[in-house]
Design a protein with these regions (language model features):
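All-alpha prenyltransferase/terpene-synthase fold signal
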Residues: 1-247
Length: 247
């Protein structure tokens, strides 16, 4: 399911680089990428049928539906400088965080854990996914392109107002705000230096990382009451890594 979402994402976003390598659509074209993504979706449901578990099918069917809703929501906000922080958070919950949540709940579900434990693991994954996506959006304005494995400024070129830019527009002076609005409307990647200056001036990267750390802390808090051990330590470490990677 995750791989299929990446194939479709790269087509929608017209991306040509992922994890430092050419995307499938850049090599084989959009049609092949969409069809292979569709195949992986259908294959995942074939595998679920083989498991013969209605709870698993219900969880993943709901999850894939919400991911699709998130992608549509994101499209509605492309080139929209009026995108609010609340709207941004709704998009990342649906397009990213719910897949994390499904993955973490599935482990509990497969092991026969009770409903309370499943809820804890689902909430952990949801908070982890939020933290991960915000940190990823920060990297689009701060990382080394080689280390990041994708082109810096892709979000800006696509007209996506992610949290750093949303915060900068809300806290810039009026003249800067109007210039930033125009950049978002045009999807003007050539204006990256001006955008970076505005983001730095407003402290927007620091603000965004604080928000990511808040969600990472909430993810760890969701684990309270679960048995200590290597698995719990790994989950706590993953929450911290999701935010600290590349920073």
């Amino acid at each position: 399911i995750h791989t299929s979402t990446l194939l479709h994402d790269d087509v929608v976003d017209e991306s040509d680089l992922r994890r430092g390598r050419s995307t499938a659509n850049a090599i084989w074209g959009n049609a092949a990428s969409v069809l292979v993504g569709d195949f992986l979706y259908s294959r995942s449901f074939q595998l679920m049928v083989e498991i013969d578990s209605m709870p698993v099918m219900r969880l993943l069917a709901d999850t894939t539906n919400r991911i699709a809703e998130g992608e549509v929501l994101q499209l509605l906000h492309v080139h929209n400088p009026d995108t609010t922080e609340a709207a941004y958070l709704e998009v990342i919950e649906r397009k990213t965080a719910v897949l994390f949540a499904a993955g973490t709940q599935l482990g509990a579900l497969a092991s026969g854990a009770d409903d309370a434990t499943q809820r804890k693991l689902y909430d952990y994954g949801l908070q982890l996914g939020r933290a991960f996506q915000i940190a990823d959006d920060v990297l689009d304005y701060s990382a080394d392109a080689g280390a990041l494995g994708k082109n810096l400024g892709d979000d800006l070129a696509e007209g996506k107002a992610t949290l750093p830019l949303i915060h900068a527009m809300a806290h810039a002076d009026e003249a800067t705000r109007q210039r930033l609005r125009g950049i978002v409307e045009r999807g003007d990647a050539s204006a990256m230096p001006e955008v970076l200056a505005a983001i730095e001036g407003a402290g927007s990267l620091d603000y965004s990382l604080r928000r990511a750390h808040e969600y990472a802390a909430a993810a760890e808090a969701a684990l309270d009451g679960l048995p200590d051990g290597e698995a719990l330590a790994a989950l706590r470490g993953l929450a911290r890594y999701a935010v600290d990677r590349g920073h």
